């Protein structure tokens, strides 16, 4: 907060009561919105630090873009801590381990440019893993790029993101 006091995040609250937790985004997974649910940093631009914090937490599922913020040493430490890592929707993973999926170096491609993995596909993976907890789960799912299409005044971009969001809501 503004007094430099650490405030418990939503994911920390959920984990404290035994819920499973997840983050899903079409931006970098360390971007402002997903970061605000799980990290303690002074600036949204501290994406390397956010990745380090995520790697040292017990988040059950993390799916999105941003591999460039996870150096090999951090990925190896994360995997060695008992988690699984995928970088393609076609990769196999152990359903009993925490899962990190980073599908691009930066944000995922816009929906209208045929991104490799849809928001709905990521949500299906996350929910299927998280839903096994009898105490419930919290997952933040963000269709991150609707805003970006608006900034660019790009109707195709906005339409693709809205259609992707509609598919997610229909799921």
Regions from the language model: what does each represent?
Residues 1-2, 11-122, 127, 131:
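Surface-exposed loop and adjacent secondary-structure segments within mature catalytic domains
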């Amino acid at each position: 907060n503004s007094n430099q006091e650490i405030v418990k995040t939503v994911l920390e609250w959920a984990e404290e009561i035994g819920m499973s937790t997840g983050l899903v985004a079409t931006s970098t997974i360390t971007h402002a919105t997903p970061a605000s649910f799980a990290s303690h940093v002074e600036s949204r631009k501290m994406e390397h630090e956010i990745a380090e914090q995520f790697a040292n937490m017990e988040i059950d599922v993390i799916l999105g873009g941003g591999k460039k913020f996870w150096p090999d040493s951090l990925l190896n430490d994360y995997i060695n801590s008992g988690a699984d890592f995928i970088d393609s929707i076609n990769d196999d993973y152990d359903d009993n381990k925490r899962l990190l999926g980073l599908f691009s170096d930066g944000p995922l491609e816009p929906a209208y440019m045929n991104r490799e993995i849809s928001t709905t596909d990521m949500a299906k993976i996350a929910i299927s893993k998280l839903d096994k907890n009898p105490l419930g789960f919290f997952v933040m799912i963000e269709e991150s790029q609707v805003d970006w299409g608006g900034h660019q005044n790009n109707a195709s971009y906005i339409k693709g993101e809205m259609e992707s969001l509609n598919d997610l809501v229909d799921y």
